[in-house]
Regions:
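N-terminal signal peptide
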Residues: 2-32, 450-455, 470-477
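Glycoside hydrolase catalytic-domain groove-lining segments
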Residues: 235, 239-242, 247-297
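Alpha-helical scaffolding within the catalytic cores
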Residues: 59-61, 114, 225-237, 268-277, ...
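A solvent-exposed, charged loop/short amphipathic helix patch at secondary-structure junctions
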Residues: 94-99, 142-178
């Protein structure tokens, strides 16, 4: 064995004896520590306009159409899951009585069971996402347009007991609302987990940390989640303990495009999601799947830049997320032009980056975690990412699909992974081992000299993709 490799092995023996990070569940798709998932009705691009999209680099592909069943990602909107009480924002109509306090949970269970059996006819691994955005289970978080649920709840209490003061009526209404909301949220999860236990059940947008203050002062924006919001997330311990996956959103608005603030925004949201994932059991992390969009949140046709893919996907992968779900609505498919734009974005921008992160995540998992865990950034605020080293690897397109050239991990790759990443193992037993480190490449190219271990800056990952498309070549050169 080369002396340098021997020293590296000894180092890993010393560092890998314990397991500092919590463990988590294995990935939905084996051998893919970080999953890329597509959830949009883009099959319409081919059926309407003859423009198929290249989704071959996504590990799971599904549709959001109401008619689509047996999808690997099943998202349940308010018209697809039992009884969902809410007040229609446009008409003011009370749908299903409007309030969680008024839901017949027996009827809700029966209807939800029918919906689950329709949309998930066979129990197989995948995601099951409950999308209830009309109201929130915590009284204090129903602000703005959602204040209507507090108003109506108070009015109902006063109607039953006119002798109560305003404060007394509100206190009583708060208790009744939160008790019913918690019961509704938990019962819905319980129904899903009982009928389709192989699915990962959770609520879209949970957890959130409401770090939107860049709208007030972009220059001073730190991205930090307000302490009060973290405390409120602590109060949702009952929800985190019942969820088998967490589905936070890291959508970016156009105002954050290509900015350091975008990365801060996402980083703190992901750190909070990971923190919340261990609240119910400090030694176990509930899998986190972050929702992204191919376009900016407040746009229908402006696609995410390469830099913002790093700020969203790159951050999520480095901080220990199990994957990202790229969600799109009908705007992606409503015209031939929109389908063409989506196809061009995938080919020129997104697919090369997906291949980059997928490959680097797998190599790191193999090198550090024996493929029995995913790599997680040691220091959450470091600008290090699960990217291929552009000095060794190339992503190329030569008369066919994108491919990665460069071989397996070198000693420098493994050393760099070890310096910056730990393992989050897929069970309670330690997954870091010295065995795989003997298998790193010991070829003449790397044997003579060791680099400093420093990689080019974050932005230089684009160099790796320069050969993939002429567009990227133009952008970078």
């Amino acid at each position: 064995m080369n002396p340098n490799v021997a020293c590296l092995v000894i180092q890993f023996l010393l560092l890998g004896a314990g397991q500092a990070s919590p463990w988590t569940s294995p990935p939905v798709k084996s051998d893919h520590p970080f999953l890329f998932m597509w959830n949009a009705p883009t099959e319409l691009c081919e059926s309407r306009f003859g423009l198929p999209l290249d989704l071959s680099h996504f590990h799971l592909v599904s549709s959001t159409l109401k008619s689509a069943t047996d999808q690997s990602i099943s998202i349940f909107y308010n018209d697809r899951f039992g009884i969902v009480p809410y007040v229609d924002e446009d008409t003011g109509e009370f749908v299903d009585e409007g309030l969680p306090q008024l839901v017949d949970l027996k009827e809700h269970r029966e209807l939800a069971e029918d919906d689950i059996e329709f949309y998930i006819p066979v129990d197989q691994p995948g995601l099951a996402v409950l999308d209830l955005e009309e109201w929130r289970p915590q009284w204090v978080r129903n602000w703005g347009g959602k204040d209507i649920y507090r108003q109506i709840s108070v009015e109902r209490v006063k109607a039953r007991n006119g002798s109560l003061s305003d404060d007394e009526a509100e206190d009583r209404a708060k208790i009744l609302f939160e008790r019913a909301a918690q019961r509704y949220f938990l019962r819905s999860l319980r129904i899903g987990k009982r009928l389709r236990p192989k699915r990962l059940w959770g609520y879209y947008l949970y957890p959130d940390c409401y770090n939107y203050d860049y709208n007030q002062d972009m220059d001073e924006f730190t991205g930090e989640c307000p302490d009060i919001e973290k405390e409120r997330n602590d109060d949702l311990l009952w929800l985190w303990g019942a969820s088998t996956a967490l589905y936070p959103s890291i959508y970016l608005e156009v105002a954050l495009r290509d900015s350091a603030q975008a990365r801060r925004f996402v980083r703190h949201r992901m750190v909070e999601a990971v923190r919340v994932s261990t609240l119910a059991n400090g030694s176990y992390s509930v899998p986190v799947y972050a929702y992204i969009r191919p376009v900016y949140k407040d746009s229908t046709d402006e696609y995410m830049s390469e830099m913002d893919l790093v700020s969203t996907i790159g951050e999520a992968a480095a901080l220990g997320a199990a994957g990202v779900v790229s969600w799109g609505d009908m705007n992606v498919t409503d015209s031939e032009d929109s389908c063409f734009d989506a196809r061009r974005h995938l080919v020129d921008v997104m697919n090369p980056y997906i291949l980059n992160v997928s490959t680097a995540s797998r190599l790191c998992s193999e090198a550090l975690c024996q493929s029995r865990g995913r790599c997680v950034r040691k220091r959450w605020d470091d600008d290090v990412f699960l990217h291929l080293d552009p000095r060794r690897y190339r992503i190329e397109r030569r008369r066919g699909p994108l491919t990665v050239s460069g071989g397996g991990p070198s000693r420098d790759d493994v050393d760099w992974f070890d310096r910056h990443f730990d393992c989050m193992c897929y069970d309670e037993s330690p997954c870091r081992s010295v065995e795989t480190f003997n298998a790193v490449q010991d070829d003449p190219f790397h044997a003579g000299s060791r680099s400093s271990g420093r990689r080019p800056s974050v932005g230089s990952y684009f160099l790796l993709m320069a050969a993939a498309t002429s567009l990227l070549g133009a952008l970078l050169g």
